[in-house]
Amino acid sequence: MPRKGNTPKRDVLPDPLYNNKVVAKLINSIMLDGKKGVAQKICYDAFAIMGEKTGKEPLEVFEEAMNNVMPLLEVKARRIGGATYQVPIEVRADRRQTLGIRWIVDASRKRGEKYMRERLAGELLDAANNTGAAVKKREDTHKMAEANKAFAHYRY
C-alpha cells in the first residue's frame, strides 16, 4: 500500500486522426517496445480496411465493437474461512473499457492473418457483428459471473 495516498489517474491525450481518447488507448495497447508510430499505422490501416469492407464510418464500427466486447460483470476471488469463492462484481466503466481493448488486441494477435492490421480489422469487424474471440471472452466472463451468482452476498 502506498504511504502517500493514491496517485491521480493520468488522462490520455486523444489520437491525432480521429481526436478520440478510446482510439488513443487502443493505439497504446497495440504498441510494443515504445514504437507508437508503428502502432498508429497498424490502427489507422485497420480502420481503413474496416471502412472499405463495411462502407460505414470506421469509428462507428469500432464503437459498436467496443460495446459488444466490454463486460458488465466479472468474478473476483475472495477468501473466506479457508475457502476461495469466485464472487461476481460489477465492472467499473474505466475497467470495462480497458478490458474491452485488451481482449480485442489479444484476440487480434492470436488470429491467423499475415499482417496485424488485417488481424485487428478482422477482430473489430467480428466484434461489431457479435462474433469472434473477444466477444467469446466476454460471454465466458459473464457465464462465470452467472454460475457464481450464489456468492454475490460476499461482495466487497
Curated annotation (Swiss-Prot):
GO molecular function terms noted in the UniProt entry: rRNA binding; structural constituent of ribosome; tRNA binding
UniProt key word Hydrolase: no
A GO cellular-component term linked to this record: small ribosomal subunit
UniProt keywords, alphabetically: Ribonucleoprotein, Ribosomal protein, RNA-binding, rRNA-binding, tRNA-binding
Function: One of the primary rRNA binding proteins, it binds directly to 16S rRNA where it nucleates assembly of the head domain of the 30S subunit. Is located at the subunit interface close to the decoding center, probably blocks exit of the E-site tRNA.
NCBIfam families membership: rpsG_bact
Protein name, UniProt field: Small ribosomal subunit protein uS7
Lineage summary: Bacteria, Bacillati, Bacillota, Clostridia, Eubacteriales
